[in-house]
């Protein structure tokens, strides 16, 4: 699967600290690999969006929008309503320099050494933000020089509003760079252990080649990825089956198996008994 690099791959001038794009498509995509070169607001207008990152994943509809820290992620875009022909999102890109300049200009206080925070933030629309997004749509139709001047004002307007309504957590997260590569790797694995991502997708989120990912995995977990993820899924299945009302037929697909028989066989190999026997004990 090709990797999309944003905003570089869009037909816009993106050398400035701020740029905008009215993204519309009639095609859905599933777990598209995306490299965000800048921090990005995705103001969803039509459709459904799901994003996987190294720290968290989220799913939104047109009632919400996302702030995503620059880096790598997987994106799923779906057209949800039958009367809609397109998926549509207004993308507002900004680099860290734009944010730092804003902080200095406005004397914004924030925690400089934050504890681990998400790399994706979700916000719900309100009346002010709905009007704000409409103004971005209008700006996106203007020529580049006019856009660049107006976006500086719109960026400050947006950040001021979000700080006053949401606090500064999102700013702290944007400015926090992960120092420990091992921590980053473990976060990717632990957060996605039940998400049924391929090794290629996981290595992408970990910012590694597939061969390096396998090597690092063996070093950290002393086993192969396939065996470790299998064990994690089966442990999760055992936890779910502690609820006597849960049947093996209810969970085998959630655990990542294509058939009930394969799930039962794998469960018996690990625990020595079938899922049904496990529940009876």
What is the predicted function of each stretch?
Residues 114-127, 140-195, 200-205, 219-227, ...:
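Short, Lys/Arg-enriched, Trp-marked, Pro/Gly-tolerant hinge/linker segments that flank
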Residues 1-14, 30:
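A short, N-terminal "cap"/entry segment at the start of jelly-roll beta-barrel domains
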Residues 187-191, 196, 200-203, 219-264, ...:
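Terminal helix-turn-helix DNA-binding modules in bacterial transcription factors
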Residues 63, 213-217, 262-263, 267:
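Short hydrophobic/aromatic patch on the recognition helix
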Residues 15-112:
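N-terminal regulatory/effector-sensing and dimerization cores
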Residues 30, 106-133:
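Aromatic/histidine-rich interaction motifs
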